[in-house]
């Protein structure tokens, strides 16, 4: 259910590197489909409950690889109890040399009040420690699942990769403001690039989250390509908060990006295309946010970014009309990656679904 998954690199208040991988709700089922290739509905349904999980799973195998000699990692399998209360948890120490360690389910103490699987927790000695983890579920007799084939390397240097990236451009919009920002960058003038969004902008799924999040990588790529001094004159602001929709984004734009008028960003990437599903205004609030940013006196450039969930869903159909009305550049990740996930027999994806997604909601 996890294959070479990066863990670690998360900020911590107590000096311990805790990295949870949540398996509640549909998360474990999605991992089983995406990583394990399982399509047996009976098996998938059993993974949703603690009772079904323990009936199905004989043991949990965990292997970790990392340059962490003599440190080790503590792995915990946790369940949640009735009405979301804390459930039973069992742990084991894992070496980081790739050796598989086995947790036999019947040899552990579990509570009868456990209702659902909750998390795989990896505890590293220090917050900045990073490793890769593989978690396998060994099933009891009578259940059959397909063998897992290793993914080939991502085909970066291929025409197909270029075609995939090109598909992400939903609209170039009226790019006069973008051109102005690029000229500022080339001229070495002070420029501020800001990112506003939810957990994807925050860096969930990226390991380490601050260095490998899409916002940081985008900022670094822009500086490398367009500035004469590797971005020495470019200010980077990342305002991503997990679980926040555009209703809070309007408030956070003032607080976290403009700092109540003290900062005037030149380029803003807005990413709320998966957090706004519950927006009762059906996009009106999102448009208010876009108008607020777009109408600033310094005339910043605005790019709308539509990320995607592992079930090939986002809010492009609802939000793209906003971008078209305002003639904004728009990037739709769904159009880029989802079509090539569904290749035919004998064909190769540029990047597989399990390579692209860290979990149900976040890219790796």
Kindly give the residue locations of the regions a language model identified.
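N-terminal secretory targeting modules
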Residues: 1-196, 201-209, 226-232, 358-363
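Residue-level detection of beta-strand scaffold positions
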Residues: 100-102, 272, 289-290
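Conserved SGNH/GDSL esterase-like catalytic core that processes O-acyl groups on lipids
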Residues: 155-287, 298, 308-315
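Catalytic His-Asp segment of secreted/periplasmic serine-dependent ester chemistry enzymes
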Residues: 164-176, 276, 310-364
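Surface-exposed alpha-helical segments enriched in charged/polar residues
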Residues: 220, 291-295, 320-324
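General small-molecule cofactor/ligand-binding pocket signal
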Residues: 237-239, 303, 331
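A short helix->loop->beta-strand "cap" motif at the edges of active sites that frequently abuts
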Residues: 294-303, 328
């Amino acid at each position: 259910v996890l294959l070479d998954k990066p863990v670690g690199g998360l900020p911590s208040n107590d000096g311990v590197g805790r990295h949870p991988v949540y398996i509640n709700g549909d998360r474990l089922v999605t991992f089983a489909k995406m990583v394990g290739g399982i399509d047996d509905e009976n098996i998938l349904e059993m993974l949703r409950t603690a009772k079904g999980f323990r009936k199905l799973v004989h043991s949990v195998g965990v292997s970790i690889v990392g340059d962490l000699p003599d440190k080790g990692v503590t792995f915990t399998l946790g369940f949640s109890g009735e009405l979301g209360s804390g459930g039973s948890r069992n742990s084991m120490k894992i070496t980081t040399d790739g050796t598989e360690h086995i947790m036999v389910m019947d040899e552990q103490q579990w509570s009868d009040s456990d209702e659902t699987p909750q998390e795989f927790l990896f505890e590293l000695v220090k917050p900045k420690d990073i490793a890769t983890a593989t978690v396998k579920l060994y099933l009891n007799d009578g259940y059959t699942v397909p063998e897992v084939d290793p993914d080939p390397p991502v085909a970066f240097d291929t025409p197909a990769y270029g075609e995939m990236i090109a598909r992400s451009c939903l609209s170039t919009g009226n790019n006069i403001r973008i051109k102005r920002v690029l000229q500022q960058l080339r001229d070495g003038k002070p420029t501020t690039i800001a990112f506003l969004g939810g957990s994807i902008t925050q860096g969930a799924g990226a390991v380490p989250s601050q260095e490998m999040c899409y916002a940081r990588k985008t900022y670094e790529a822009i500086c490398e390509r367009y500035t004469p001094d590797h971005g020495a004159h470019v200010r980077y602001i990342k305002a991503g908060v997990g679980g926040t929709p555009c209703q809070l984004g309007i408030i956070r734009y003032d607080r976290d990006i403009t700092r109540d008028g003290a900062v005037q960003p030149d380029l803003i990437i807005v990413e709320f295309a998966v957090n706004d599903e519950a927006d009762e205004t059906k996009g009106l609030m999102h448009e208010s946010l876009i108008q607020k940013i777009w109408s600033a006196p310094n005339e910043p450039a605005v790019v709308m970014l539509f990320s995607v969930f592992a079930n090939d869903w986002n809010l492009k159909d609802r939000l793209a009309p906003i971008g078209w009305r305002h003639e904004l550049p728009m990037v739709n990740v769904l159009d880029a990656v989802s079509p090539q996930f569904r290749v035919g027999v004998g064909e190769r994806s540029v990047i597989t679904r399990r390579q692209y997604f860290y979990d149900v909601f976040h890219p790796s």
